[in-house]
Amino acid sequence: MIHCLADNIHSPFGNTTADNFAVLRRGAQRPTLHCLPGVPEPLCAALWPEGAIEARYAALYGAAEGLSRFEQLALLSIRAALAQTELDVSAPDCLLLLSTTKANVRWLAAAPESFVPRTGTLGETAAVIARHAGFSTVPVVVSNACISGAHALLLAARLLRQKAYRHVVVCGVDEQSPFIAAGFQSFRALSLAPCRPFDAARDGLNLGEAAATLVLSSAAPRRTVETPRAALDWCLVSGAVRNDANHISGPSRTGEGAFRALRATLPPDVSRLAFVSAHGTATPYNDEMESRALSRAALSALPVAAYKGLFGHTMGAAGVLETLLSFRAVEAGCVPPVQGFAQLGVTCPVSVSAVERPTHRRELVKMLSGFGGCNAALHFAPAPDVADAPRGFIERNWTPVAEVRLTSATCSVDGEILPLSATGEALLAAIYAEFIGGYPKFHKMDPLSRLGFVASELLLAAVRRKGHCLDENTAVVLVGHSGSQAADTRFQHTIADPDNYYPSPAVFVYTLPNIATGEIAIRNGFHGETAYFALPAFEANRVRHLVCTAGTDPETTALVGGWIECPTADRFEAHLHCYLPQAPSLRP
């Protein structure tokens, strides 16, 4: 079993999970209007007062030692959760998983040209946090848009089931900045009033910032006198990630990926579920999509909880924060109120209420969806109600059947070097024109997505030449270091000058590194798992291990993935493989 040992939420509404849940039940607070420096329009959001995070960190731990605001926030939550345990996180069987979408992206504003500080990349940021928290193992970043937190919990469970680690600390964290606010405003996705999930009058989301930490373990928790009497021994029973294969920024009209994730995750007896914790962004299309997915999964009558009417969209923190609030709700015997809801405004009926409802049931499902077409679902239940055998998990060996190596100067497929007519920034376009073609969307992609697209096209062509046919259950997993750094720098240029302020949604959407996986899924009709992970540095064995974690999903039929790094348009490398499950050996 995968047990949840300890947890914490740091948000503008409280510094413990209990405090935040109490605010949620009271329903007296909502996001408020804020003006961010350099952003012409105000935004309604759940944000800390200026300097509050730094002041709390200094009061508890002294000098911040050059840590960014983002890093201090993550450490506040991680240390608060670990203080509830007796774990020695310096042990080799402990791992930190950091779930975030943009991490230290605000640091780009100080140097929007070619220089990015040491904490400007995902991998380096995680290394700094892990070192200050006391970990000796190398951390992993999950940066998979809005589902990052849920995907990090699923990855943690898989690593624990594989016995790669004994304890995994998952911290979901994001802060708001002019970069993020400008991007969402460019999509016209923000409401100027407190948001209204699933309501007929909903007109957009609110942004929020938070850090939420959950300590998972293959060992059962030790109850102490400080353990709340109502606390349950929560276990992550099953989970899945599926792609819409539809659009990089718009949800599927049929809720395809969300439905597939639910179908792979739901328990055999859904009558045991207290409620489903929905993504509930309060945008017209997302809430409509979720209602369709719930209807297709025959869950229209199941109570729905949605938390963004209070906390806003906390992005990389959302999956962990909303899971923890759901734990507390089940322990309190209630379905939390959906703040901002008044009248149902989605096509397919779902059970949403603005008032708290009682429940005696003890299991729950968490849903999330995000840019890049990704969707996640997780099923949690208390330990006494969980069978020892995990659902949705299988151990298999995976064999590489094709390989592509691509840098800004060379390209090889299965060891055979391709003749190239260009190098540097012009190389990807040249390979596309000479060997691929026929896909105009290529020309609008950012450098990272172009690199992933070209490398995957060459790889899949080699796979087909060998007689293999990949189906829709193929997973795509990319691992890098600096994420979408090239796109981040480009978008920062569009908002740096107040007199020449022109944030573009077509540029902003590519500031999420998992978009590269979405482009590959859309091109090939892959509905399997898609993910982007980051490491502080390249390690071949770890990259392969992370890619193959998607192969523990019983529905995965093939894996496409590997290392991909593109800090600038003219400096890049990709080393991808296609893996197929190894046929079991026949016994004599």
Segments (PLM) and residue ranges:
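Alpha-to-beta junction loops
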Residues: A164-R166
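Glycine-/small-residue-rich beta->alpha transition segments that form the dinucleotide
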Residues: D174
